[in-house]
From Swiss-Prot:
Keywords: DNA-binding. Homotetramer. It comes from Staphylococcus epidermidis (strain ATCC 12228 / FDA PCI 1200). This is Single-stranded DNA-binding protein. InterPro entries: NA-bd_OB-fold, Primosome_PriB/ssb, ssDNA-bd. The gene is ssb. GO terms for biological process: DNA replication.
Length: 131
């Protein structure tokens, strides 16, 4: 089985950054367009919740803001939680790689590849299968 997602889209707002057990985590939403128009002749948009960890989260914090065009590869994950007696389901894109494709950061610069910090953190529940 394969769980590999590739998207290109724009960040809908600045990433939310927090730390858990000494690891930085970034959560953000990316808007992507579908390749067809709806009944009103308008292009439909999907909004994907994304989550990144470690150095990738640090780079997202440094080099992105609302409107940044990004290319992402990763895995879709679903989870559920209880809140006030109701079960909620969430589907998230766990970021493996991200490419910043437009200069939307505070300095209006796009970082070069050698400016990125290497990411070595993997979340505990991320299963890596080597073929």
């Amino acid at each position: 089985m394969l769980n590999k997602i590739v998207i290109v889209g724009r960040m809908t707002k600045d990433a939310q950054i927090y730390e858990k057990e000494d690891n930085k985590i970034a959560t953000f939403c990316v808007a992507t367009e579908r390749n067809y128009k709806d009944d009103n002749n308008e292009i439909s948009t999907d909004y994907l919740l994304c989550k990144a960890f470690g150095k990738t989260a640090t780079n997202i914090e440094k080099y992105t803001s609302q409107g940044t065009l990004v290319g992402i590869t990763g895995q879709m994950r679903s989870r559920k939680y209880e809140k006030e007696g109701q079960t909620h389901f969430v589907t998230e894109l766990y970021v493996e790689t991200i490419k910043f494709m437009s200069p939307k950061n505070k300095n209006n610069e796009t970082p070069s590849d050698n400016q990125f910090e290497n990411n070595t953190y993997q979340p505990d529940d991320l299963e890596i299968i080597h073929i």
